[in-house]
Amino acid sequence: MELLNTIVNEINNILWSYVLIIVLVGSGIYFTLSTRFVQLRLLPEMIRLLTDGVGTKTEGHAVSSFQAFCVSTASRVGVGNIAGVAIAIVTGGPGAVFWMWVIAFIGCATGFVESTLAQIYKLPRKNGSFHGGPAYYIKNALHQPGVAKLFAILISVTFGLIYCSVQANTIALSAQTAFNISPAITAGFLAVFTALVICGGVKRIARFTEFLVPIMAGLYILVAIIITVMNIDKVPGMLALIIHDAFSPQAAVGGGLGSAILTGVKRGLFSNEAGEGSVPNAAATADVTHPVKQGLIQSFGVYVDTWLVCSATAFIVLLTGQYTIGGELTGIALAQASLASIFGGFAPAAVSFMILMFAFSSIVGNYYYGEINIAFFESKSKAGLFLFRALVIFMVVFGSMAELSLVWNLADLFMGFLCLTNLYAIIRLYKYAHVALNSYLEQKNKGIAEPVFDPSVLPSESGIHAWGVDKD
């Protein structure tokens, strides 16, 4: 096992340190330029669409645009937003934060494209809901069913099973450290609560995340604001340090400027998931009048994840001054030490509570992606979905009590392949998202407040099964 873990880790180092960074950043820049900075010029529209979607009621089993946004944010905003950012600062220096911001800006364009495509090629269900994602547009638009099936299997295993076990493991370790609670007890509680949420189906998951995500992110950002206000005199110096170290040859341990850039880009990509092919699964479920609406909303999710939540961790760590570049104190422990310097002995419990919210929301969001891709195989029997739910609950229990280094490395490997497959698809299908964007803007320029999508504007209607058509 140790040999296998070493081999997988070496492959991951090459894949995530070089290949994927080049492809993800390159495609992000391409989408940014070709959409004429859609993530910047339509930022007010993103905010309008998101705020208009809050509290929107949908009929039957349909999912609102805000609920779909909350599901994807639940998956995005996980333990990595606390531990990952702390690790980035220790290994890449404060300058890594700047490069996380940059990659988030670029990734917004990629997120827009993949989510818009997911909406264009979504499939309707008899109960009035929708489902879709990369597996669906790979099959229906690229007409490569074999690749689509492989993608569906990989994302179901990676997100639905492996990532759920990793998040459960983090919750159990945090509870044991802060409250001396046995991992077995934590496993039992997690199994029960996970079952209650996921067995209620897509609509219950959407309602659960719609309730939890704003509270979860809001509380954490509030803590960061309190610390920022308490250290307001240090803020100009902190921002100057971030900018200076982002371009300083001595910025980080073991690689200087290159290390700062590489670390920031890697952590940014891991956190916001733009281009990885996960978020489109949630985007496709939204009931909207135009695909671009959900593309813009999901694009804004990248800002929320990195510019708000990840920045909150960065400010907490940098303003409290508990970090040492290249030091042993890192990850969750560094976040706890940073909060303890402000709030005292209450900090471990507070961090444990935040981890519980972040990690459990990720479990629910990750399961959601798995369920959507299980549905891709169109089995009339519910046995497959029942088995998948049972496996998810089992992996939550297993993850709470296991060492998961090999499992985590395998998940990263699978995610790398998912990412490359999705980028291949969205680059080839980009013209459809671009035409949809132009259609949306033309209607807005004519004074139409809520544009309606007409698939006839696309170069081809092949593979579209919603939007009033059903063509092969």
Regions found by a protein language model. Name each.
Residues 9-48, 90-128, 304-312, 413-423:
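Extracellular loop-to-transmembrane helix junctions
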Residues 4, 34-39, 80-85, 161-172, ...:
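Transmembrane helix-loop junctions in multi-pass membrane proteins
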Residues 23-30, 34-47, 169-175, 181-231, ...:
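Membrane-interface loop-to-helix entry segments
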Residues 1-79, 89-96, 428-472:
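N-terminal alpha-helical transmembrane segments of multi-pass membrane transport
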Residues 27-32, 103-128, 134-198, 354-363:
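Helix-loop-helix module between adjacent transmembrane segments
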Residues 114-122, 223-241, 249, 255, ...:
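Extracellular/periplasmic helix-exit of transmembrane alpha-helices
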Residues 57-91, 117-135, 139, 256-303:
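Alpha-helical membrane segments and immediately flanking helix-loop junctions
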Residues 37-64, 87-89, 93-97, 109-142, ...:
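Flexible loop linkers connecting adjacent transmembrane helices
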